[in-house]
Amino acid sequence: MATIYATGKRKAAIAKVWLTPGNGEMLINGKTLDQWLGGHETLKMKVRLPLEATKQLESMNVKATTLGGGYSAQADALKHGITKALVEFEPSFRAILKPMGLLTRDSRVVERKKPGKKKARRSPQFSKR
């Protein structure tokens, strides 16, 4: 079977994912998942979720490059990319992944700062007298 390519996005992070049938090897930016995320167990679980849900954790190799954003956003982008690649690999996985909300792109991004405000919505302190 050929290599499947997909992209995932979250906030400012973009993940390019290549999925191939194999032995469950994961390389992100040239590092293994444990080297890349260190002690962030929740983020590792988040990345593995689509593969575990479809029982493909031991039978798919994942090669990915991530850029932009922080570790959490990159992990979410990677999860989104893996999910899209799995659905392209086997369309029947859509029925498993769609109800879990993994195919939906999380469109929440940082709200811009407005003039006259301290942050996006925080106003300067108001004094009546």
UniProtKB/Swiss-Prot annotation:
Keyword Ribosomal protein listed: yes
Tell me the superkingdom of the source. Bacteria
Please give the Gene Ontology molecular function terms for this protein: RNA binding; structural constituent of ribosome
Mind listing the UniProt keywords for this protein, alphabetically? Ribonucleoprotein, Ribosomal protein
Q: Write out the ranges of the annotated region (Disordered).
A: 107-129
Q: Which InterPro entries match?
A: Ribosomal_Su5_D2-typ_SF (IPR020568), Ribosomal_uS9 (IPR000754), Ribosomal_uS9_bac/plastid (IPR023035), Ribosomal_uS9_CS (IPR020574), Ribsml_uS5_D2-typ_fold_subgr (IPR014721)
Task: Name one process (GO BP) from the record.
Answer: translation
Per the UniProt entry, the disulfide pairs are: none
Q: Where is the composition biased (Basic residues)?
A: 114-129
Instruction: Output a single Gene Ontology CC term carried by this record.
Output: cytosolic small ribosomal subunit
Q: Does the entry feature the keyword Zinc, yes or no?
A: no
Family annotation (PROSITE patterns):
RIBOSOMAL_S9
Q: Which PANTHER family match?
A: RIBOSOMAL PROTEIN S9, SMALL RIBOSOMAL SUBUNIT PROTEIN US9M
- Family of the protein in this entry: Belongs to the universal ribosomal protein uS9 family.
- Name this polypeptide is given: Small ribosomal subunit protein uS9
Q: Which organism is it from?
A: Sulfurovum sp. (strain NBC37-1)
Name the encoding gene, please: rpsI
